[in-house]
């Protein structure tokens, strides 16, 4: 029985996608830093944009985000991100206990525009955008082309409630025809920047 299990394990590992092995580790050009050393997080969401990723080596998705906050909650450093339920990334956020927020140099704005306007349901948008997945020691996706990566564990999630919104927020959802976003609060576990 042990030989059979070992043989099956070897067979299964040989059949895994090649990218799972080649992208399994973060490059050595990433350096761990403190969340307190992140420069001007408002610029990350507001001006530079960022990618939100969730999943693992077998299946992942990412999208561009422009809404988010850094802060403290329950004595822990946190990042809050917002995802419309219609987004494919939301399926990954619901299934996984971690997410990553990845910042990029300004020359990657075209890639961020692409992953923000195309769905991963219909093809490998990350490859088309020229983004190369790498994975943290916890198995969470980041991108080789990024220059900042924040790994978070989801500690709270909840959909916005229309009855609690002001008129401007309600008008946003009426105009865009989106369902109210889901807020994901993640405790910051690790932060890296490029050397």
Model-derived features with residue positions:
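Basic, polyanion-binding surface patches
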Residues: 21-195
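Positively charged n-region of N-terminal signal peptides that target proteins for export
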Residues: 1-4
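Sec/Tat signal peptide C-region and signal peptidase I cleavage site
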Residues: 16-20
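Bacterial N-terminal signal peptides
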Residues: 7-15
